[in-house]
């Protein structure tokens, strides 16, 4: 708290100017050094930050939330009209940590509401439970909005530079900026951090800073250093490097601009953390709410599960009498040893296998088939996205498999070559569904040229004309649905997803079927999305699936197996 001299200086600035400046400077230095002294304790606190242990989180099927930034709060909407607005004026969602979730609606709450509206509300709750927590990644670096934020706010910083360079300096914009920074710092604090709150309130006391500005001795550089020390104390580990880079900036305007930018990122970190910390509650609330809404609709329409029953019946029939396939055809990259194919279909049938087969069937669903399972209507668009992603991976893996059979381990032993070939193929197959023949013609030309150039760079013999023609022909044949290489890869990706549903993604990645090792990272992403979607759906509709599967599976088995225990 300010001492008596400082308080007297505020009341009589003309009589106690020297004492006030001296006293205030001492307090500010003490606050800055105090924040600086917390560096080591901050890192100690990181190691002891409360987090869900693997046992407690995974045992309940809840993903562990990342370490929280030290505080939370919301950005203000903008500076006053006297100054142009800076670039970090991000409009963030207003999220309050610890805010209670809305209670589940009671019986009859939607009594007069149309069913279509209730279904829409259920879908919105369903979407909220799957909210993307990485908000800052939503915009491309080359997007129009991103470019605008880089160019337009330069007016503010140019204006600030002109004001600080004037004789005498004009601190009006600097004061508005310091006020905004102060509020951001305060918003990053937790309620229990009262000592830090008092430090910030004292060091960035706007009344006193206005007095200094009126006298022309406001030390912007010194205040910036204090703010940096406080940011070191408050930022999440991911921002340490960015804050450290700011310490090397000597120009006051560039430093303030960097501070404001990093503070915006720190705010986003807190929003992301708050959302992630609420995910388990959102998911649990979503499960209960979706099930209650579905049961209400089922009570009014007993035929609501007809399509779901037909969907599961078809899956069980496929497992009892599987159709022949070319899955056993070997490819040049396959290796000896066990793979997920060794655990293909257990006998007799189990609820897990019927459900996994049913979920996989949705990835090849005929768009004209209107008998889509009622329990998965809210996820239909997500399933279509997964289908598109899986189809692109099928084409990518097929291209890599064919290319490796011609160039061998010489080129495909180079991670740089494989990554380059994957980038080329990925960029070209995005339009595969609309024009497969044309796309594969381009892919075959690009891949052949890449192989030829790489062999030449390594001093190796290029492909013969015969091998080149054969490579181009095999790559172009991938455009046909009946192509056996494409069919093999497609079935193996489906088998991988089935293993993910039963065993989990990490265990399924340990023994990938032949031909899939080069797309392991992409498969892991696909598998995680598939498992997340299907497990949530299973949790919501487990009671209904259990009742349906009782009529499809040997009753003796079902007595000891329940869908909910998978």
Curated annotation (Swiss-Prot):
<keyword id="KW-0966">Cell projection</keyword>
<feature type="modified residue" description="Phosphoserine">
    <location>
        <position position="104"/>
    </location>
</feature>
<keyword id="KW-0472">Membrane</keyword>
<dbReference type="GO" id="GO:0016020">
    <property type="term" value="C:membrane"/>
</dbReference>
<keyword id="KW-1133">Transmembrane helix</keyword>
<keyword id="KW-0744">Spermatogenesis</keyword>
<dbReference type="GO" id="GO:0097225">
    <property type="term" value="C:sperm midpiece"/>
</dbReference>
<dbReference type="GO" id="GO:0007283">
    <property type="term" value="P:spermatogenesis"/>
</dbReference>
<dbReference type="GO" id="GO:0036126">
    <property type="term" value="C:sperm flagellum"/>
</dbReference>
<keyword id="KW-0968">Cytoplasmic vesicle</keyword>
<keyword id="KW-0217">Developmental protein</keyword>
<feature type="transmembrane region" description="Helical">
    <location>
        <begin position="393"/>
        <end position="413"/>
    </location>
</feature>
<dbReference type="GO" id="GO:0007281">
    <property type="term" value="P:germ cell development"/>
</dbReference>
<keyword id="KW-0812">Transmembrane</keyword>
<feature type="compositionally biased region" description="Polar residues">
    <location>
        <begin position="25"/>
        <end position="37"/>
    </location>
</feature>
<keyword id="KW-0597">Phosphoprotein</keyword>
<comment type="function">
    <text>Plays a role in the process of sperm capacitation and acrosome reactions. Probable receptor for the putative fertilization-promoting peptide (FPP) at the sperm membrane that may modulate the activity of the adenylyl cyclase cAMP pathway.</text>
</comment>
<dbReference type="GO" id="GO:0010737">
    <property type="term" value="P:protein kinase A signaling"/>
</dbReference>
<dbReference type="InterPro" id="IPR008862">
    <property type="entry name" value="Tcp11"/>
</dbReference>
<dbReference type="GO" id="GO:1902490">
    <property type="term" value="P:regulation of sperm capacitation"/>
</dbReference>
<dbReference type="GO" id="GO:0007189">
    <property type="term" value="P:adenylate cyclase-activating G protein-coupled receptor signaling pathway"/>
</dbReference>
<feature type="region of interest" description="Disordered">
    <location>
        <begin position="328"/>
        <end position="347"/>
    </location>
</feature>
<dbReference type="Pfam" id="PF05794">
    <property type="entry name" value="Tcp11"/>
</dbReference>
<keyword id="KW-0969">Cilium</keyword>
<dbReference type="GO" id="GO:0001669">
    <property type="term" value="C:acrosomal vesicle"/>
</dbReference>
<feature type="region of interest" description="Disordered">
    <location>
        <begin position="1"/>
        <end position="112"/>
    </location>
</feature>
<keyword id="KW-0221">Differentiation</keyword>
<feature type="modified residue" description="Phosphoserine">
    <location>
        <position position="461"/>
    </location>
</feature>
<comment type="similarity">
    <text>Belongs to the TCP11 family.</text>
</comment>
<feature type="compositionally biased region" description="Low complexity">
    <location>
        <begin position="332"/>
        <end position="341"/>
    </location>
</feature>
<comment type="subunit">
    <text>Found in a complex at least composed of MROH2B isoform 2, PRKACA isoform 2 and TCP11. Interacts with MROH2B isoform 2. Interacts with PRKACA isoform 2. Interacts with ODF1 (via leucine zipper motif).</text>
</comment>
<keyword id="KW-0282">Flagellum</keyword>
<feature type="compositionally biased region" description="Basic and acidic residues">
    <location>
        <begin position="1"/>
        <end position="24"/>
    </location>
</feature>
<dbReference type="GO" id="GO:0045920">
    <property type="term" value="P:negative regulation of exocytosis"/>
</dbReference>
<protein>
    <recommendedName>
        <fullName>T-complex protein 11 homolog</fullName>
    </recommendedName>
</protein>
């Amino acid at each position: 708290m300010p001492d008596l001299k400082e308080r007297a200086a505020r009341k009589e600035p003309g009589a106690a100017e020297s004492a006030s400046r001296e006293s205030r400077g001492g307090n500010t230095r003490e606050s800055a050094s105090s924040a600086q002294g917390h560096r080591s304790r901050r890192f100690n606190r990181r190691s002891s930050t409360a987090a869900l242990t693997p046992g407690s989180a995974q045992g309940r099927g809840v993903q562990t939330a990342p370490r929280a930034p030290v505080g939370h709060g919301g950005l203000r909407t903008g500076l006053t009209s006297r100054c142009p607005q800076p670039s970090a004026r991000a409009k963030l969602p207003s999220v309050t940590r610890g805010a209670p979730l809305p209670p589940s609606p009671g019986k009859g709450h939607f009594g007069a509401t149309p069913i279509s509206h209730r279904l829409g509300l259920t879908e919105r709750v369903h979407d909220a439970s799957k909210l993307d927590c990485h908000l800052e990644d939503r915009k491309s670096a080359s997007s129009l909005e991103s470019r605008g934020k880089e160019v337009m706010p330069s007016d503010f910083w140019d204006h600030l530079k002109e004001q600080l360079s004037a004789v005498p300096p004009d601190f009006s914009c600097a004061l508005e900026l310091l006020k905004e920074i102060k509020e951001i710092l305060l918003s990053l604090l937790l309620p229990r951090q009262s000592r830090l709150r008092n430090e910030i309130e004292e060091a960035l006391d706007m009344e006193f800073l206005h007095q200094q500005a009126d006298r022309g001795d406001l030390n912007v550089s010194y205040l910036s250093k204090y703010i940096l020390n406080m940011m070191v104390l408050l930022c999440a580990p991911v921002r340490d490097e960015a804050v450290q880079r700011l310490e090397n900036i000597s120009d006051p305007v560039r430093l303030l601009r960097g501070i404001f930018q990093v503070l915006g990122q720190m705010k986003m970190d807190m929003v992301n953390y708050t959302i992630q910390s609420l995910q388990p509650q959102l998911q649990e609330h979503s499960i209960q709410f979706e099930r209650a809404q579905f049961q209400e609709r089922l009570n009014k329409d007993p035929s609501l599960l007809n399509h779901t029953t037909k969907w599961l019946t078809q899956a069980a029939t496929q497992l009892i009498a599987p159709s022949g396939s070319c899955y056993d055809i070997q490819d040049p990259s396959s290796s000896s040893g066990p793979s997920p194919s060794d655990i293909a279909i257990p006998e007799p049938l189990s609820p897990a296998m019927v459900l996994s087969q049913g979920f996989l069937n949705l990835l090849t669903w005929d768009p004209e088939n209107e008998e889509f399972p009622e329990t998965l209507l809210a996820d239909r668009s997500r399933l279509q996205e997964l289908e598109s992603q899986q189809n692109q991976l099928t084409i990518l893996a097929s291209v890599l498999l064919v290319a490796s059979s011609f160039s061998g381990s010489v080129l495909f032993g180079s991670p740089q070559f494989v990554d380059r070939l994957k980038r080329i193929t990925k960029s070209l197959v995005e339009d595969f569904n609309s024009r497969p023949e044309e796309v594969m013609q381009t892919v075959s030309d690009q891949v052949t040229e890449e192989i030829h150039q790489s062999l030449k760079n390594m001093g190796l013999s290029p492909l013969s004309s015969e091998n080149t023609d054969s490579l181009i022909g095999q790559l172009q044949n991938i455009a046909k649905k009946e192509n056996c290489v494409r069919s093999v890869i497609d079935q193996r990706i489906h088998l991988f997803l089935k293993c993910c549903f039963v065993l989990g993604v990490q265990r399924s990645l340990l023994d990938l079927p032949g031909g899939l090792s080069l797309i392991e990272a992409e498969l892991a992403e696909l598998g995680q999305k598939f498992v997340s979607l299907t497990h949530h759906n299973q949790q919501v509709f487990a009671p209904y699936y259990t009742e349906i599967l009782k009529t499809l599976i040997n009753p003796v088995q079902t007595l000891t197996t329940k869908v909910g225990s998978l």
